[in-house]
Amino acid sequence: MTFVRELEVASQNSRAFNVTLWFIFIFGLLKLVPFALRFLSMVFDLFVLPPVNYAKYGCKAGDYAVVTGASDGIGKEFASQLASKGFNLVLISRTESKLVALKDELEGKFNIKAKILAIDISADSKDNYNKIYSLCDDLPISILVNNVGQSHSIPVPFLATEEEEMRNIITINNTATLMITQIIAPIIIRTVKKHRESGDKKLKSQRGLILTMGSFGGLIPTPLLATYSGSKAFLQNWSSSLAGELAADNVDVELVLSYLVTSAMSKVRRTSMMIPNPRTFVKSTLRNIGRRCGAQDRYGTITPFWSHAIYHFVIEELFGVYARVVNEINYKFHKSIRIRAVRKAVREAKQN
């Protein structure tokens, strides 16, 4: 007698068996349907929906976008691509010469206005924050990009992390991000309200936007990058909470999650299917603002680059970001990076 035939006989002779089968079917349906809907939503976000129209954020109204960490890498790309959409810019970074060069380039190329401020954010200086306020308070600002960030120089055990590095990571990734947002967000709210009440039909649906750069290091607990991982995980809850607070003020708040991107901070130089360059990553981010992409279960969060989104989705759905196996794989990955970095440092020391 075949297995199917045995099921048929059991079904005919046992009501309890039938009830059990229906329970299994309904339970499976309740699990599979949401999974399928989340997967289809991700695919739709990434590959079907058209790019976001930035007119709703004031690109045609002469509004400004503030970009921190603007002189290199991802921050520089945010500045360039926002300028290409018509936004004026406030560029904040450490190196004045780079800011001047970028200002001249973008003003000449895109016929926009750019203001610059060279400050060392790691100093956590009240004077720095006053300078930001003085520069920005009178400007019509509709976008803030919290891009400035710092990681460890190489993967390192928490107990071996130098105090200065630990303090700098927390100051730059957390304290400065909160302080700058507390300065700029009221200006964004004011700008949006003024546009919406102006009577101009083109501005009646005006919105503001606050983007904060997150990381898979904050999504997934990351041994050997413990301080950095914790600082980015903090941004997840803070940004999502802020999204709820500012929704009534017509300000969209998004945490942008990325895996590896070629940059000075990641120390990765070669692009691949999993590792885009800053231009490609920022293009994906600006294209998909307001959509979850790979972060289907996370409010106010976006994993915009397609391979990062799929990777995020698989980890969340199959294992969970806090699973032991994910933690162990992450530890082995960063341990191998640390070993190579230490060997390289030893070789360079011998050569010198």
Curated annotation (Swiss-Prot):
Write one Pfam family the protein is assigned to.
adh_short
> What membrane topology does the UniProt entry give?
Single-pass membrane protein
Q: Which GO terms describe its molecular function?
A: ketoreductase activity; very-long-chain 3-oxoacyl-CoA reductase activity
Top-rank taxon of the source lineage equals: Eukaryota
Give the stretches traversing the membrane.
20-40
Species source reads: Candida glabrata (strain ATCC 2001 / BCRC 20586 / JCM 3761 / NBRC 0622 / NRRL Y-65 / CBS 138)
Q: Where is the active site?
A: 228 (proton donor), 232 (lowers pka of active site tyr)
Q: What name has this protein been given in UniProt?
A: Very-long-chain 3-oxoacyl-CoA reductase
- Name the keywords, alphabetized: Endoplasmic reticulum, Fatty acid biosynthesis, Fatty acid metabolism, Lipid biosynthesis, Lipid metabolism, Membrane, NADP, Oxidoreductase, Transmembrane, Transmembrane helix
UniProt similarity note: Belongs to the short-chain dehydrogenases/reductases (SDR) family.
